[in-house]
Amino acid sequence: MPLDLSNKRIIMIHGLASKPPADVTHELWRKTLTENIRVGHRQLAKNLDANPQVFETAYWADAVPHHIPDDAAYCRKLALQVDKVIAERREIKDRFHVGMGEKVGSFFKDRGLDLVKLLAGALTVKDDVMTSFLRETELYDQDQYIADRIRAPLESALRRAWDEGREPVILAHSMGSFVSYDVLWRFAHRKTADFKKYNGKRVRMFVTLGSPLGEPSVRNLLFATHHQDHSLRQFPTNIERWHNYACLGDVVSHQKNFHDIFFQPMRKLQLFPANKNFRSIDYADLHNPFEVVTHAGNRNREKRNPHKSYGYLAQPRLGSWLADYLLDRLL
């Protein structure tokens, strides 16, 4: 039986701006999420196949000066690596997830992975990841024209969703998470004409993946940093649920717990609807099996990149929460 998804919209916003073209990025994210959901909800995934408009990408990579999208050969290899992540998710099902009561070392050992080597390997990708992250963060901070262009796709996607009567969810990876935070803050608090109309609108779920928002230096870039003494204006007030995911070895989200920084003070201010469970959750020390595309510059280096978005998009808990949203099972 066809499912009515007419009021649903999953808005996806990527991280560091070295990216495939917009259409390739969108399709790889859509595919990974749909296949994640398919593991536990085959009929729902079939409905998503028939309703691709449920997914929208807020693509901002081309807002960065001198951006050159990845070429077709790289994109083909990337798609193969994404397929490997999907295959592992299908094969081991919910055992893909590191349980909250499970010993992290045992989880990785059971999968033939040496935890020490995994963490050491993550450091070999650290310089490349952090160099790109710091360069783009500096642009976001120092050039407001570029920052406005980076925020614009998500702002447009949210306006469109709300104007169409949809209940949007935001999935934000890496730098996309603090771009999203700024956008949500502006929709909650700005009184100019292009924002005031939406002051009362909300997102059903804000999902941060590999997020650097735990870093004080990142939070200092945000609009909210100028309102730390103004209670409600410290935070976006338009988030119904906030779930944060951090993979083991991810050098960007190493500050993995948002409870003290965001969740507890937001609950104290009653910014999450009252008397509901699971409004804010930290999922930490997660398994990200993504292996980078091999090229001449990295043949002898560790191939795992625990920060990569595709390993986050395959997380079982994310799949089950999105299924609950799409099936109207969120309380």
Where do the model's predicted regions map?
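Solvent-exposed, charged interface segments at domain starts and junctions
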Residues: 90-95, 161-162, 167-176, 256-262
